[in-house]
């Protein structure tokens, strides 16, 4: 089940609130310009599926997002517990960073923890199959796929170069709960 846990930066062990209803999660995130929605991911996709297979399965949804928001690049990140670089990728995504463009993810299988650092608060969004999240450009965040990842997510970009992170150098991500905590 998707959820949103909201923490004050001074209290990483105790969330101020935990939300599990789509409408509550979406409205809380919308206050900060973050879009959260649930789309039907009817075509079964498993970690390890090729990028082409995933994109072809969701071509209609992808085209809708690209047209509506002007995205120019799409790719797929698909990881499972057998991936040879899972530890390196997890470590990289767990560093707080931001992007010069919106970060859009549509989870078509599995789950991941998208954590946003906005002012004095941290918003931990557990995204699962069918969840669509769009994080505005410049928002500090990190992503945890867990020690044993299982997810497939479609990523959309305004930048033809795809995923380009600007790391903040702050260690805040290490103080907050991880996906499997």
From Swiss-Prot:
Pathway: Amino-acid biosynthesis; L-methionine biosynthesis via salvage pathway; L-methionine from S-methyl-5-thio-alpha-D-ribose 1-phosphate: step 5/6
Keywords, comma-separated and alphabetical: Amino-acid biosynthesis, Dioxygenase, Iron, Metal-binding, Methionine biosynthesis, Nickel, Oxidoreductase
Details of cofactor binding: Binds 1 Fe(2+) cation per monomer.
Cofactor section: Fe(2+); Ni(2+)
Marked site: May play a role in transmitting local conformational changes: 102
Gene Ontology molecular-function annotations: acireductone dioxygenase (Ni2+-requiring) activity; acireductone dioxygenase [iron(II)-requiring] activity; iron ion binding; nickel cation binding
Reactions it catalyzes: 1,2-dihydroxy-5-(methylsulfanyl)pent-1-en-3-one + O2 = 3-(methylsulfanyl)propanoate + CO + formate + 2 H(+); 1,2-dihydroxy-5-(methylsulfanyl)pent-1-en-3-one + O2 = 4-methylsulfanyl-2-oxobutanoate + formate + 2 H(+)
Tree of life domain: Bacteria
Example of a GO biological process term: L-methionine salvage from S-adenosylmethionine
Residues that coordinate or bind Ni(2+): 97, 99, 103, 141
EC number: 1.13.11.54, 1.13.11.53
Site note Important to generate the dianion, residues: 105
Pfam short name (any one): ARD
Residues that bind Fe(2+): 97, 99, 103, 141
Disulfide bond sites: none
Sites marked May play a role in metal incorporation in vivo: 96
Oligomeric form and interacting partners: Monomer.
Protein function: Catalyzes 2 different reactions between oxygen and the acireductone 1,2-dihydroxy-3-keto-5-methylthiopentene (DHK-MTPene) depending upon the metal bound in the active site. Fe-containing acireductone dioxygenase (Fe-ARD) produces formate and 2-keto-4-methylthiobutyrate (KMTB), the alpha-ketoacid precursor of methionine in the methionine recycle pathway. Ni-containing acireductone dioxygenase (Ni-ARD) produces methylthiopropionate, carbon monoxide and formate, and does not lie on the methionine recycle pathway.
Family statement: Belongs to the acireductone dioxygenase (ARD) family.
Protein name: Acireductone dioxygenase
Source species: Pseudomonas syringae pv. tomato (strain ATCC BAA-871 / DC3000)
Upper classification of the organism: Bacteria, Pseudomonadati, Pseudomonadota, Gammaproteobacteria, Pseudomonadales
């Amino acid at each position: 089940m998707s959820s949103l846990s909201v923490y004050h930066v001074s209290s990483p062990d105790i969330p101020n609130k935990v939300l599990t209803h789509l409408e509550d999660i979406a409205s809380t995130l919308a206050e900060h310009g973050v879009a959260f929605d649930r789309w039907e991911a009817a075509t079964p996709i498993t970690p390890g599926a090729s990028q082409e297979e995933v994109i072809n399965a969701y071509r209609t949804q992808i085209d809708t997002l690209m047209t509506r928001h002007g995205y120019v690049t799409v790719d797929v990140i698909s990881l499972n517990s057998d991936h040879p670089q899972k530890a390196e990728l997890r470590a990289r995504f767990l560093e707080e960073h931001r992007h010069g463009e919106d970060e859009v993810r549509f989870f078509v299988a599995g789950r991941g923890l998208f954590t946003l650092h906005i002012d004095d608060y941290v918003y931990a969004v557990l995204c699962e199959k069918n969840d669509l999240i769009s994080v505005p450009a410049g928002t500090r965040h990190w992503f945890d796929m867990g020690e044993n990842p299982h997810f497939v997510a479609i990523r959309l970009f305004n930048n033809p170069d795809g995923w380009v992170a600007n790391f903040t150098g702050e260690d805040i991500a290490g103080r907050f709960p991880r996906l499997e905590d």
